[in-house]
A protein has these predicted regions:
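Domain-scale recognition of functional cores that engage charged ligands
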Residues: 1-159
Length: 159
């Protein structure tokens, strides 16, 4: 149980949308080295353009809902934005497997988790999640038009 209510006046700093939202999400990826995080490079730190571009995705740092993402990136795509390389990342492509049975074709799933880490506590606490189903090349509304059994919701979990 938290020591405060959301409606109480408290001394906190909120992470605001959009700039801090974008900075915290994609901006941190090149700094995280883990088998659970796809390899990610700031474009302006790229030593050479990879030969296997079919395994990479080009993403603008400050975009939302997949806008500006080049899923099938080409050398000209990279060369075009290279002058603005400080606001782009190149990320290893993640292949989502269609494992959720639906009435027509299996869907891919993504589960995003949000944790809060209360000061003085040893671990963060899971507070909410976002579950999304997709049948498109990417997860998001623009990539799932005219598809059924796709979209987002909150998932229930045991405490």
């Amino acid at each position: 149980m938290l020591q405060w209510n959301l409606t109480d006046e408290v001394n906190v700093e909120w992470v605001c949308h959009p700039n801090w939202f974008f900075r915290i999400s994609k901006y941190t990826l090149p700094f995280i080295k883990s088998r659970y995080v796809p390899e990610t490079i700031f474009l302006n730190e790229l030593k050479s353009i990879p030969e296997d571009l079919e395994n990479w995705v080009l993403k603008p740092l400050y975009s939302f809902a997949g806008h500006g993402v080049k899923f099938n990136v080409t050398r000209p795509d990279i060369e075009e934005v290279m002058p603005h390389g400080d606001v782009f990342i190149l990320q290893k492509k993640v292949t989502y497997k269609p494992v959720v049975a639906t009435l027509d074709e299996p869907a891919k799933a993504e589960l995003r988790l949000m944790y809060l880490w209360e000061e003085g506590k040893t671990r963060p606490q899971l507070v909410i999640n976002l579950a999304r189903l997709s049948k498109g090349v990417m997860i998001g509304v623009d990539y799932n038009k005219n598809k059924t059994w796709v979209g987002g919701t909150v998932g229930y979990y045991e405490k």
